[in-house]
């Protein structure tokens, strides 16, 4: 086609330290649908990805398993690619950041930035594990928060009060690797001076390359000033040594996005594609990154600046998506909703999930929810009950009554109905293009309803029993099969395996937007075989049960401080009843909850305690969405001295259990409790 586009698409690189789960698959399914759609439209499109295979966690896990990091990442890569293939994620090339191509481009970009004085050297103080003889990343240090005195907090921020700080500010710090008390040591680190690119980034972020919500968030970061980015790590470290340096390695987040270039370069070397055509500064090709909203800082600031500084093109757009919840809550190991890709594939058809995600996804960064009950109902209703049902209702008559051949002649009304389906093609194509998949699915299902209404009205099962109705029957079932062909073509980016089966049934060479303009007339089809079966609730239950068992078998995903006995907090020192009686616990109703933009972990709560309202800042953002909290009852400390924070005055504290992060659980009183009641 004359307006053929050249498009390169990437997904964020999965970390080579664990298995793929359904939360990961939101992104890969979203991207794969878009790539398949572009190819169906006749564009020259390439979809590449790779394992993110460097960093301290990989080094430590390999040590724990007694193997080399290279062996670990090779095994994980094979597991990842098996999972992706199971869900029909069709990469044109899948690579690793631990590759010669990635080493070349990471070193080249660094050298270009250094020659232009965008790299600086600074002496910093860092915690050092004297037992392991290694500098400790922030997340590998735990201790007591210097602000709220909560124990077992990470080295960069407190999940209880939301405070951010330097690891050296922690009280009673411990190495999460060995449990030893770390010592402070000076070390030289290399920094990328991001502020040198502030003007360029301010312009780039407001040229339509980002979603509006993301661009607005970046404005907040611009207001607070762009800080230099530490791009080096000290040995021992699994990664690439920095050119011209001894025992200094590229931080994993420097070479991770470079993996997009490396994977495409490997594809170019394999197929003869021109790498420079897609990556040179004045390239007219298109480059798109699909990522989660949690890594936007690296992709929308550091990455464009690195590319620009090194003389490469910047992305046409970065598409961010939200997170996945299951049954309205975070994925849970105890409930069996933290579901691994392999576990899902052991029990359910991957096309079910591809369709369900498509029916939920749009171009915004909102989180999406996998309601397991709705999942079964929607797949059974839409795919099985509407789309596949059209073919099964008509195909038998074509085979038995008309030797498997579709009719040659159509009435004007039949042609008009068919054309109404074709007239929707550009609307649906535009929705795919804009990543408004949910709306596209609604448009397609509205057409499916229309097709089923036609079959109901013409009632071929009745016509088949009446003499002299052969022509009407022939048109009814032939048009029904043609309408099915249009629908399955529109759905092909979402359910490719089902589309392939339908293609074989229809005996057509391709399914694409152009071919459906011409209906199948006087065309032979094969005998119909079931294209998809219903979702059974029993299969879902078996999957969640298996997921609970999976969690018991899995090694820890994050390092924990070694403890002699238990991971539970020890029982605190004994107090008297009089001490306890001083604390005034009250039932509180959450009447409002909102984000605190300046804080990573805090939610601002307005609490009704019966005798008035209180404002409390709670460090529960990692575990709850504000809109899910409104109307809930909880327990608060009502007589805690108000504490002035930079976000406002906190007039108490709500009670929650759990170690922190996603594992936080607000206390909820039993039914009958009322705001203001004292807990005693």
Curated annotation (Swiss-Prot):
- Per the annotation, the residue ranges of the short sequence motif 'HIGH' region are 14-24
Its gene? metG
Q: How does it assemble?
A: Homodimer.
Q: Could you say which EC number(s) this protein's record lists?
A: 6.1.1.10
List ligand-binding residues for Zn(2+). Answer: 145, 148, 158, 161
Localization annotation: Cytoplasm
Q: Which organism is it from?
A: Hydrogenovibrio crunogenus (strain DSM 25203 / XCL-2) (Thiomicrospira crunogena)
Q: Among the record's GO biological process terms, what is one?
A: methionyl-tRNA aminoacylation
Please report the name of this protein according to its UniProt entry. Methionine--tRNA ligase
